[in-house]
Swiss-Prot record:
<dbReference type="GO" id="GO:0019843">
    <property type="term" value="F:rRNA binding"/>
</dbReference>
<keyword id="KW-0687">Ribonucleoprotein</keyword>
<dbReference type="InterPro" id="IPR019984">
    <property type="entry name" value="Ribosomal_uS17_bact/chlr"/>
</dbReference>
<dbReference type="InterPro" id="IPR019979">
    <property type="entry name" value="Ribosomal_uS17_CS"/>
</dbReference>
<dbReference type="Pfam" id="PF00366">
    <property type="entry name" value="Ribosomal_S17"/>
</dbReference>
<protein>
    <recommendedName>
        <fullName>Small ribosomal subunit protein uS17</fullName>
    </recommendedName>
</protein>
<dbReference type="GO" id="GO:0006412">
    <property type="term" value="P:translation"/>
</dbReference>
<keyword id="KW-0694">RNA-binding</keyword>
<keyword id="KW-0689">Ribosomal protein</keyword>
<dbReference type="InterPro" id="IPR000266">
    <property type="entry name" value="Ribosomal_uS17"/>
</dbReference>
<dbReference type="InterPro" id="IPR012340">
    <property type="entry name" value="NA-bd_OB-fold"/>
</dbReference>
<comment type="similarity">
    <text>Belongs to the universal ribosomal protein uS17 family.</text>
</comment>
<feature type="region of interest" description="Disordered">
    <location>
        <begin position="1"/>
        <end position="44"/>
    </location>
</feature>
<comment type="subunit">
    <text>Part of the 30S ribosomal subunit.</text>
</comment>
<dbReference type="GO" id="GO:0003735">
    <property type="term" value="F:structural constituent of ribosome"/>
</dbReference>
<feature type="compositionally biased region" description="Low complexity">
    <location>
        <begin position="1"/>
        <end position="21"/>
    </location>
</feature>
<dbReference type="GO" id="GO:0022627">
    <property type="term" value="C:cytosolic small ribosomal subunit"/>
</dbReference>
Length: 119
C-alpha cells in the first residue's frame, strides 16, 4: 500500500515537472495579447447655462427628433455637467464637449474647445 502511494506521488511530481518544462518552452512562442481598442467617444455641441462652480460648467444640449407618426420635429434639451479645467468658458458660450470617464457623481463630460464666445 505504501509503495502504491509513493508511486502515485512520484507520477504526480513527474507530471508537474513536465508541465513546468512545457510552460518554460511555451514562453518564447507565446505572443502577447493586443490591447483592446477604445470605443468611439460621444461628442456634442451645446451652450453654457451656468459657470458658478469651480472647474465645472453646466451645458444645455439640444436634441431634435422627428415624431414617428405625425412627422413634427420635437426639440428636447438636457443639461449636463462638464469639466472645465481652466474655467475658461462663460455663460452663453457655444462649446464642444467629449464624453469621458466619470469625474464625479454627476460629471461625465469634458470641455474640448470654446467654439464661439458670448457677446
Amino acid at each position: 500500500m505504501a509503495e502504491a502511494k509513493t508511486g502515485a506521488k512520484a507520477t504526480k511530481s513527474a507530471a508537474a515537472g513536465a508541465a513546468d518544462g512545457a510552460s518554460k518552452e511555451k514562453g518564447p512562442k507565446h505572443t502577447p495579447s493586443t490591447p483592446k481598442p477604445r470605443g468611439r467617444r460621444k461628442t456634442r455641441i451645446g451652450y453654457v447655462v451656468s459657470d458658478k462652480m469651480q472647474k465645472t460648467i453646466v451645458v444645455e444640449l439640444e436634441d431634435r427628433v422627428r415624431h414617428p407618426l405625425y412627422g413634427k420635429i420635437i426639440r428636447t434639451t438636457k443639461k449636463v455637467k462638464v469639466h472645465d479645467e481652466h474655467s475658461a468658458a462663460g455663460i452663453g458660450d457655444r462649446v464642444s464637449l467629449m464624453e469621458t470617464r466619470p469625474l464625479s457623481a454627476t460629471k461625465r463630460w469634458r470641455l474640448v474647445e470654446i467654439l464661439e464666445k458670448a457677446k
